[in-house]
């Protein structure tokens, strides 16, 4: 699809959905196959329908149109923060940790770059064309440059031995980050996973059937709703900035998003230890508990407790 065709499709979709979208209703944001350009078209078409500029109707926009600094790398940064938080709890030194990342799009490439900057050794990366392994560490900067100069593909990257995606998933590493598609880890390959820690950069990369297999093997898995929440968090920051008419610095965005993810991880980890359950189940409990307490306050059946200040 050409750029002009994609723009016409995006604008037609917005025309059909403009009553559903809104800065206080449903707010679209980028995901696979979309980015700042599509968000700009959507915002522009929505604004035309409303007769005024409404930049808070979407997030992930170009910065010149009200986008937030730190949004592009936000999901990958959240994966990095979650990974380091988990390694700390597991008493694994990041400077001695090996990492394999399946998927080298926005999330995977940023996670690789940020983890390498913090001392981890990224030994394997992959995309849809296959993977590359280097026991001494992939040169992440060169891999990103190669991808950018090769239409977004890692194909023919010279920085490591060629491997398959399945080989990457079953490598003996400290950290495995599935950052591609859903149902990457299933009951068919879960028994072959050798990583000590899985951090879900993608949405739903582990099937329901694979979860108990990983648990039985003692593999810690940071669930997607926690690990890749950085993008949603900074999207919220962008919306706040649009509504207030303020611009935050990159350091402020990083500091606030990192703090939220660390606090959420520590809360989920504490619940998992208290009840001897997986981090995924603990994350669901934390989320449901917060919603439940909110409803009980609203209907008058609950009274304020001191620990609610930290929730």
Residue ranges and their predicted role:
Residues 58-62, 66-73, 77-172:
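Glycine-rich phosphate/diphosphate-binding loop of Rossmann-like nucleotide-binding domains
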Residues 25-30, 52-58, 124-127, 177-178, ...:
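General beta-strand structural signal in soluble alpha/beta enzymes
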Residues 1-94:
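Glycine/serine-rich phosphate-binding loop and adjoining beta1-alpha1 elements at the start
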Residues 130-221:
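Rossmann-like adenosine-cofactor binding region
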Residues 107-111, 183-185, 206-208, 229-231:
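Short glycine/serine/threonine-rich phosphate/pyrophosphate-binding segments
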